[in-house]
Structures are given as C-alpha cells and as structure tokens.
C-alpha cells in the first residue's frame, strides 16, 4: 500500500498538513476550482522561480496565499513589481482581497518537488537521465537526507518503447507512518514526448507526533502564545484565594489560641485550693 499511495495523503494529519485550509458548504466546488487555478497560475509562468508548494487559507472576504520558493528574488521582482502583479492577478481571479506571503525554502537540495523539477530541467536539456538522477541523489545525500529514491518513466533516451527506471540510495520506508517522507512529481517536455519524474526523500522519523501537530496548529494561528505560558503567573493550590478550601489553613492559628492560654490559668486554680 505504501508503495502506491501518495506519501503526503497517506500521512495527512500525522506528519503532514493540508495545503488548503478553509471550510465551505455550498461553495465547496467553487473553492476547489479556484485553488486549482491559483496553483496553475503560480507554476505556469514561473518555472525558473523554483516553487515548492502553494498554501491557501480562506476567510469570508480574504484569501491568504503562501508561496514557498527557492528563489524568492524572482517572485518578488525589482522593488516588488512582480509580487504586485501576482497579487493583482489573484484578486482578479478570486474577487477578494489577497494577502501574498513569499517564503524561502532553506534547503532546496532536500525538497522533493524542487529535486524533481531540477531533474526534469536536465532531461529537457538533453542530459542523460541516469546522470541527472545520480547527480541529484548525491546532492540530496550531502545535504543531510537519510534516503532518496528517484524514478523516471517515459521514452528514456529516445527509445521506441517507454519504460521506467529508478535509483535509490539510503532508506526510504514508505510503510512507516512516523517516517518524514517528502514526495514530488514533475514532467519533463522533450522532443520524444513527456517524461515523468517522481522523487521520494526520507528525512528521518518524527519522534513526537503531538509536537508536530502543535507546531502546525501554532503556524496556522500565526504563532499566537498559548494560554498559561511563561508570562502568566501560576495559580496556587486548589481553591487558591477564591475562597472555599483555600482559606482553611488561615483559620487554624485562631482556633489554636485558646489551647495555648489554658496552661497559664491552671496554676492559679491550684494555689487557691491550697490556701
């Protein structure tokens, strides 16, 4: 099962998160159609920008688009001209106010989508598919990946009959749900037809899945501080100063005061009887 299914969908809610975050009832199909159009717009005209993924959040009158790219300078443009153009196109498409965020991918050598695009660009430039695959695998392993698998399918080398070949280095546990496996796909357009490139990159196991979910929730909430943080003073024991059981220790000294005076009165009574 793990060999066939998309690794992102297989681990959704465990180690990966939704790329589109919104809720709709009657407008569901319209929003899905808009999301497809937005992602198609981002990838069609900016192949050189190295866009890894596009995340979309929606409210009633606002759309937030996060673009993860390896070359943010190309997306921003000179003095932000390209970013303004993209924002204007998105507002025309959605009819709502668009908040555009451009985020840089820190390590593009271990991003599966960017690796697939790099291999596809080399195939379009008539580079040998074996050489392109091995070069990308070496770069990913040097960058810190624990395992990588690259598969190319199509008329490889201009052959009459299409076939698929893959190379693997390290471990790529596709059945392990706690494994952080990144997946990317891209098509190379060559003179012999299209060649599909699939990339799986294993980055290690996720030790605490609850922490990953908490980080994803914090990122969606805009990094808001959680309730009961370090700046909040801690409440006392049970009840505290609100009354009830918390005030019983304060009444104990008043109840013990008569017992302390009792020994002082006893000698006076004994002297009186002796006289």
UniProtKB/Swiss-Prot annotation:
Keywords: Ribonucleoprotein, Ribosomal protein, RNA-binding, rRNA-binding. SUPFAM superfamilies: Prokaryotic type KH domain (KH-domain type II) (SSF54814), Ribosomal protein S3 C-terminal domain (SSF54821). SMART domains: KH. Residues 38-106 form the KH type-2 domain. GO terms for cellular component: cytosolic small ribosomal subunit. One of its GO terms (molecular function) is rRNA binding. Residues 229-244 have a biased composition (Basic and acidic residues). Part of the 30S ribosomal subunit. Forms a tight complex with proteins S10 and S14. The keyword rRNA-binding applies. Residues 216-275 are annotated as: Disordered. Binds the lower part of the 30S subunit head. Binds mRNA in the 70S ribosome, positioning it for translation. GO terms for biological process: translation. InterPro entries: KH_dom, KH_dom-like_a/b, KH_dom_type_2, KH_sf_prok-type, Ribosomal_S3_C_sf, Ribosomal_uS3_bac-typ, Ribosomal_uS3_C, Ribosomal_uS3_CS. The gene is rpsC. This is Small ribosomal subunit protein uS3. The keyword Manganese does not apply. It comes from Streptomyces avermitilis (strain ATCC 31267 / DSM 46492 / JCM 5070 / NBRC 14893 / NCIMB 12804 / NRRL 8165 / MA-4680). Residues 216-228, 249-268 have a biased composition (Low complexity). Belongs to the universal ribosomal protein uS3 family. It holds the Pfam family Ribosomal_S3_C.
